[in-house]
Amino acid sequence: MEIINGPVLPRYAAPATGALTSDAKISGQLLRRVHLRRRACGLQGDHYRAARRFFGFPSERHARSGWVWPVCCSYGSSSDGDGAAAADYDASGEEFVNSSVMEAVELRSVSDGFVIKMRDGKNLRCVQNNPRVLRLRDSAPHHAIVLKMEDGSDLLLPIIVMETPSIMLLAALRNIRIPRPTIYNVVKEMTERMGYAVRLVRITEMVHDAYYSRLYLAKIGNEEETISLDLKPSDAINIAFRCKVPIQVNRRIAYNNGLKVVQPTPSESYVSSDQFQYTRLDRPDDQPCFEAQEFDLVRNMLVAAVEERYKDAAQYRDQLFMFRAKKKNMI
C-alpha cells in the first residue's frame, strides 16, 4: 500500500449516452431542490451559482479550471505501482529480523540501566545496545511486551503497552483458556471469513518514541493479492501470536533501541523438571510473593470481565487496588 499526496484536478470523461442521461436527471433534480429551498429562504445570487457548480451538469461543474482540490489516493495491486510485487515485503529495502515473544511483565529504569521483570519472577538486568539513544527517563515500572531477536545477537526490544494487551498476551503464552472471545480472536475469525490469512507482522519504525507496526494479510489461494494494515504493536503482536505467524523487527530499530542482558540476579538458580523452570527468588523462604499475587488478581479480573461476570470483576478490581495500596505503604 502506498500513499500519493498532491493536488489533483478532477476531469470529466464523457460516459455512455445512457449514463449521461441518468446523470443529467439526477443533477437536475438536485439543482431544482436547492433552487426551491433558496427561494423559500429568500437567498439568490452567489448561493444559487454555487449550487449549480456542485449539482449542475458535468460541463457546468468543471467549467472553471481554476478549481484544484487536494486528493489523497491509496491503492494496492499486484505491482503497487513501483514494479515490485505486493507480496514482496522487502520492497522497501529495509532489513528485518525474526523475533520471539518473551514472558515479560514490566520494564523499569534503574541507575545503571534497565530491569525487565519476567512472569516467573526473574529480573533481567539490561543496558542499552546503543548508549547514544536515550529512552525511558523515569524510573516508574511500565507494562511491556518484550521481543527477543533471533539473529544471534540476543537483543531484547521492550515495547511499553497498556496493561490489558500485556495480560492478554501473557494469557495466550500460558495457554490460559478464556471462554469468551477476545478482540484478537474476532479479528482472526473475520480475516479468515473474508478469505484472507495473516502472513506476517512487522515493527517498521519509531516516531516520537512510538513504535509503528504493520499487519500483512494475503488472499487465500492467491498470495500475490495482499493487504497491509497499520496497527498498534500491542495489537499486532497479539494477533500474530494467535495466528502463529512471524514477528519481525526493523534491524535498525533493534540495534538502536534494543537492550543487552548483562547478568542475571546473583541469587537466582534454576532447576529444569518436566520442561518447567522453577525459580528461587531473591527473597526469604516461606514468604509471600507479591508479584505472583498481583498477577493472579489482574488475571482473574480480566477473565471475569471477558466472561461478562462484571460483579466478580469489580470485586477483583477492588482487591487489586487494596493490594497495591498495601504494597505501596510497605515500601
Swiss-Prot record:
Induction: Up-regulated by abscisic acid, etephon, salicylic acid and methyl jasmonate. Residues 291-326 form the UVR domain. Residues 126-261 form the BFN domain. It is an enzyme of class 3 (hydrolase). One of its GO terms (cellular component) is nucleus. It is found in: Nucleus. GO terms for molecular function: nuclease activity. GO terms for biological process: protein ubiquitination. InterPro entries: BFN_sf, Bi_nuclease_dom. Its EC number is 3.1.-.-. Keywords: Hydrolase, Nuclease, Nucleus. Bifunctional nuclease with both RNase and DNase activities. Involved in basal defense response. Participates in abscisic acid-derived callose deposition following infection by a necrotrophic pathogen. Belongs to the bifunctional nuclease family. This is Bifunctional nuclease 1. It comes from Oryza sativa subsp. japonica. The gene is BBD1.
